[in-house]
Amino acid sequence: MKSSAEKINKNTEVSYLDAHLHLQDQRLQAQLPSVIARAGQKGVGQFFCNATSEDDWTKVIALAGTIPEVIPFIGIHPWYADSVAEGWRERLCLLLEQQSCGVGETGLDKRCPVDFTRQVALFKAQVDLALQYHRPLVVHCVRSWGPVVDIIEQEFAGESAPPVMLHSYSGSVETMRRLVTAGAYISFSTRLLGRDEKKIKKVLVETPVERILLETDSPDQLPAEWMAKGERAYNEPMWVADLYHQVAQLKNINVEDLKVSLWDNGKIFTHAAASRR
């Protein structure tokens, strides 16, 4: 039987997909054309670019307008839950009505000092918008798995619900299984390229391929040993190609088959936003 990669037209080359990053970040903006070019040379063909604050929204939308490979997501990160400006929800609604955007990056983070009650209120408000406008949702979760999983199970488990992705997953195998049962996508970051990430590698092995996405979270999540060598100051989307090869090895599958599967996953995940383009 032919593999899924072999079934594709020989003239069609499937690209790597970076399922979560921040191209609007100042660390990348200074040399963004070179960053995109290097990614393209490695075969990376799509970028899910996420805002973290209201200041990012128009920047992310502008990037998507000038770089066809960029899929925009706009939202407010939990780190900024205590500094949101009045009227943010109405302004986000207006952009969602006008633009082909997903919602994110939002979520919960007990590691940061921002009041958790405010985080929950902000997260739930953005969940409501993703549901209202039927847009894909990108979730950041650190040490907050109980409330995050409860909300996803309550709001996103139905067939009519928009898709949701847990970015840079750091939870347990058991939590992953609950999320997958609820229909969520699990995105693994370039942290997996680090030597000491045994826990996350175990989760990756147990996660069904049809629910996996891969990301760099550029310019963050540079593997610690790379940073220690001083060879690189920040992460870049081109390194997602290395992550694909690592994941293919861990899952014991052909990397070309993995590219096909994850490209399909990305298309399904972003369909709600892309359908408005």
Please place each PLM-identified region on the residue numbering.
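Mid-domain alpha/beta scaffold segments of enzyme catalytic cores
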Residues: 1-277
